[in-house]
Amino acid sequence: MTDQTTTRRVLLKLSGESFGGGQMGVDPDVVSALAREIAEAAKTVEVAIVVGGGNFFRGAQLSQRGMDRGRADYMGMLGTVMNALALQDFLEQAGAATRVQSAISMTQVAEPYIPRRAVRHLEKGRIVIFGAGAGLPYFSTDTVAAQRALEIQAVEVLVAKNGVDGVYTGDPRTDPSATLLDTVTYQDALQRGLKVVDSTAFSLCMDNDMKMVVFGMEPGGNVTRAIRGERIGTIVSN
């Protein structure tokens, strides 16, 4: 890793769906390809990652079917740890030194989440994967990504999406007139009710002047490009 004062540090948010290739569970081919992209970019950039768990459980959806929301959210958090461990394995196969930190104590599989330790890992050239969300119910992993980015002093949050390549004026899956935005302010995104990223994450970044880039995972190479800082997707800022 190069001089700490000049090295770019980013927080990459990966949805659980990106691990399953649209299916439940983990698709080894998909995660292996993703890990190779991240490992390549991490040679010159300090990379921390927050992973979702939607390929296993979605707490909000389970709670709509009558399950206690807190319990459902904890199940989702455990799903994110499974994804974190899978990604760690494939990153190490790709030659990248990696650490997993969990917001819920599980010392046999992951370190506890300690911000200063995470920063030290990054400075040593290791990729740090944050699992178990915030360790608290009612917090989305989008919000956790914004919070972790602020705490480790990343320069921006990179939100990788499946099925869309940035922020649109509406939902492109249901609104044929929706157009891709090159840039948008947090205020505008919140006022329009744009749902591509959780509104709490938008608010947290807005209040702390943290830049966000929302981009599509396809085609291959996009994750590497985003981590390196190439112009891609939609820039969300103040």
UniProtKB/Swiss-Prot annotation:
Signal peptide: none
Binding site for UMP: G53, D73, A134, G135, L136, P137, Y138, F139, S140, T141
Reactions accelerated catalytically: UMP + ATP = UDP + ADP
Binding site for ATP: K13, L14, S15, G16, G54, R58, N162, Y168, D171
Biochemical pathway: Pyrimidine metabolism; CTP biosynthesis via de novo pathway; UDP from UMP (UMPK route): step 1/1
Subcellular location: Cytoplasm
Any one Gene Ontology BP term: 'de novo' CTP biosynthetic process
Enzyme class at the top of the EC tree: transferase
Molecular function per GO: ATP binding; UMP kinase activity
UniProt-listed InterPro entries: AceGlu_kinase-like_sf, Asp/Glu/Uridylate_kinase, Uridylate_kinase, Uridylate_kinase_bac
Entry annotated with the keyword ATP-binding: yes
GO cellular component assignments: cytoplasm
Major location category of this protein: cytoplasm
Ways its activity is controlled: Inhibited by UTP.
Keywords tagged on the record: ATP-binding, Cytoplasm, Kinase, Nucleotide-binding, Pyrimidine biosynthesis, Transferase
EC number: 2.7.4.22
Family: Belongs to the UMP kinase family.
Function: Catalyzes the reversible phosphorylation of UMP to UDP.
Assembly, per entry: Homohexamer.
PANTHER family noted in UniProt: URIDYLATE KINASE, URIDYLATE KINASE PUMPKIN, CHLOROPLASTIC
Protein name: Uridylate kinase
Protein source organism: Clavibacter michiganensis subsp. michiganensis (strain NCPPB 382)
